[in-house]
């Protein structure tokens, strides 16, 4: 075992002495040591319950003959960090979490790992760390939040964000907004729609690193504890047979993950995260690969923010296993991929059926023949851009409008709320990319304000930043290269015509080639003054969004 290096031999007496101080007994030495990577934190609703949630996991690890050692990573609540300076730290936290996993597992030579994430950057950060250290690992997330209710109507966090826009327009009162605020988030868990956190938790199942049900079983459902206990037993079994993440996760696993993500209309952030996770697995994956899958994969689900269905509905309809089964049945999925259960996905979904075809549609009744996420290229995005098509109204799939440019999220919010943005505009928000932000902030406040003010069917938004999984509308993000790196989004001027053509995967600045070349040659990117030493380091080493916004010293 890996941990023999800290347990066995007379020369390890100092190590054992320290372990005894942590509660190890004579009979514990020689047993596998399982790292329990928790992410409990008091200010993130998806994580507030994880202090108690971890206890049965540790109990089951002990029963299975191993020793659990719990440690914690940090966590950021993107909703609380949204719309202000704090969002600069959200995406960078992913790298800190991956590094924390590596640091603890390698420093103590742990034999196995059970990861307990839940929210936006914690899931991909832990996935990156787990694939990097490559010890037997199982993921068991904290589970989705229940949807809120006002009368018979379901509400969620996006209802609150959009309510701010409605109040700004005069459609609702402050009292109405307070009622939404008080009812939108009724329990612990990751926010109740198919936003980034739940999208990523669902994809742990597809990648084979999470047990069936991990992505959709609610945090408050008693089955969540049963799943946690099963995960704890399973990680000990994986250590015994030495089945590691890189034995499970292959190029085909990522093909599967993108297919499911695209079929269910997951968050656009999954593109960024899966590219980064693939790199940690030693797998080359490109935006062009995602584009190909998107063109072949139909949209089978529309979950909030794209509809009134929520994660409890998706779970009731059969969950991720039912989506995988429908794709497999139609030759769009590789069922031979292994999982932490030691079974293949094909074996897992063999007896699964769709229980509600309104929530998960059959392929012959799909919402569209191509997927809920699309990659757009063009002179504005030579390396690609991302749009969640499942959240775009039909009349906005092809849109030509005049640019109105903002060089920060704050400027854009002020302009939208101040009435500068009119029907027919394409809002351009730049210098919000990985380097330019730095930190590639989410533009949920601008997009939800546009929707709340009733402009969602007449205004588009493009950015080198990214979006919350709760964003809907004609919103194109991850534009690469970004403005701070000299990308063409930096040369757009107010009044320029921009073409968004989602069916044909195009994003174009409609000026002459001569004018385009002249502007690009003369363009000198701005650089924001950043005081934080961490964000300065991040800006120096972060790569393009088309590469997953990873950190690299190469």
Swiss-Prot record:
The enzyme's E.C. designation: 4.2.1.9
Q: Mind telling me what this protein is named?
A: Dihydroxy-acid dehydratase
Q: Which reaction does it catalyse?
A: (2R)-2,3-dihydroxy-3-methylbutanoate = 3-methyl-2-oxobutanoate + H2O; (2R,3R)-2,3-dihydroxy-3-methylpentanoate = (S)-3-methyl-2-oxopentanoate + H2O
Q: What does this protein do?
A: Functions in the biosynthesis of branched-chain amino acids. Catalyzes the dehydration of (2R,3R)-2,3-dihydroxy-3-methylpentanoate (2,3-dihydroxy-3-methylvalerate) into 2-oxo-3-methylpentanoate (2-oxo-3-methylvalerate) and of (2R)-2,3-dihydroxy-3-methylbutanoate (2,3-dihydroxyisovalerate) into 2-oxo-3-methylbutanoate (2-oxoisovalerate), the penultimate precursor to L-isoleucine and L-valine, respectively.
Q: Work out whether the entry's keyword set contains Magnesium.
A: yes
Positions of [2Fe-2S] cluster binding? 119, 191
Per the UniProt entry, what species is this protein from, by scientific name? Hydrogenobaculum sp. (strain Y04AAS1)
Organism superkingdom = Bacteria
> Gene encoding this polypeptide?
ilvD
Transmembrane ranges, per UniProt, are none
Tell me the cofactor note: Binds 1 [2Fe-2S] cluster per subunit. This cluster acts as a Lewis acid cofactor.
């Amino acid at each position: 075992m890996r941990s023999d290096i800290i347990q066995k031999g007379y020369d390890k007496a100092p190590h054992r002495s320290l372990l005894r101080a942590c509660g190890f007994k004579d009979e514990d030495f020689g047993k596998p040591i399982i790292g329990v990577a928790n992410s409990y934190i008091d200010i993130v609703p998806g994580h507030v319950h994880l202090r108690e949630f971890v206890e049965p996991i540790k109990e089951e690890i002990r029963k299975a003959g191993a020793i659990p050692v719990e440690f914690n990573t940090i966590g950021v609540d993107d909703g609380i960090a949204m719309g202000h300076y704090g969002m600069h730290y959200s995406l960078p936290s992913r790298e800190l979490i991956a590094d924390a996993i590596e640091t603890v597992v390698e420093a103590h030579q742990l034999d196995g790992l059970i990861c307990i994430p839940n929210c936006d950057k914690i899931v991909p950060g832990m996935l990156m760390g787990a694939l990097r250290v490559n010890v037997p690992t199982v993921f068991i997330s904290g589970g989705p939040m229940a949807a809120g209710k006002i009368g018979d109507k379901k509400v969620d966090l996006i209802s609150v964000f959009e309510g701010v826009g409605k109040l700004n327009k005069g459609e609702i009162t402050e009292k109405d907004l307070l009622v939404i605020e008080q009812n939108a988030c009724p329990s612990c868990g990751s926010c109740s729609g198919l936003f980034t956190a739940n999208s990523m938790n669902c994809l742990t199942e597809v990648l084979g690193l999470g047990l069936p049900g991990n992505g959709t079983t609610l945090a408050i459902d008693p089955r969540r504890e049963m799943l946690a206990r099963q995960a704890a037993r399973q990680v000990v079994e994986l250590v015994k047979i030495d089945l590691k993440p890189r034995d499970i996760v292959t190029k085909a696993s990522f093909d599967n993950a993108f297919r499911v993500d695209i079929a269910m209309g997951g968050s656009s952030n999954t593109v960024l995260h899966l590219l980064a996770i693939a790199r940690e697995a030693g797998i080359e994956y490109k935006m062009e690969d995602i584009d190909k899958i998107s063109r072949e994969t139909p949209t089978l689900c529309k979950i909030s923010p794209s509809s009134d269905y929520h994660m409890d509905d998706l779970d009731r309809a059969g969950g991720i296993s039912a989506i995988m089964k429908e794709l497999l049945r139609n030759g769009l999925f590789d069922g031979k991929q292994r999982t932490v259960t030691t079974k293949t996905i094909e074996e897992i979904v063999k007896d699964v059926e769709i229980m509600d075809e309104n929530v998960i549609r059959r392929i012959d009744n799909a919402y569209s023949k191509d997927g809920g996420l699309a990659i757009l290229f063009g002179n504005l995005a030579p390396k690609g851009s991302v749009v969640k098509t499942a959240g775009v109204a039909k009349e906005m799939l092809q849109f030509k409008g005049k640019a109105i440019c903002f060089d920060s999220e704050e400027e854009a919010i002020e302009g939208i709320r101040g009435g500068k943005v009119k029907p027919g505009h394409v809002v351009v928000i730049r210098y919000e990319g990985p380097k330019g932000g730095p930190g590639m902030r989410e533009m949920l406040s601008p997009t939800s304000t546009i929707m709340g003010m009733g402009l969602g069917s007449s205004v588009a938004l493009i950015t080198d930043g990214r979006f919350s999984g709760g964003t809907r509308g004609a919103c194109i993000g991850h534009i690469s290269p970004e403005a701070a790196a000299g990308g063409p989004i930096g040369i757009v001027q107010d009044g320029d015509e921009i073409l968004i053509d989602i069916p044909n995967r195009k994003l174009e600045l409609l000026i002459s080639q001569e004018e385009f070349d002249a502007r690009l040659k003369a363009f000198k990117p701005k650089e924001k003054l950043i005081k934080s030493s961490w964000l300065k380091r991040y800006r120096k080493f972060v790569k393009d969004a088309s590469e997953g916004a990873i950190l690299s010293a190469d």
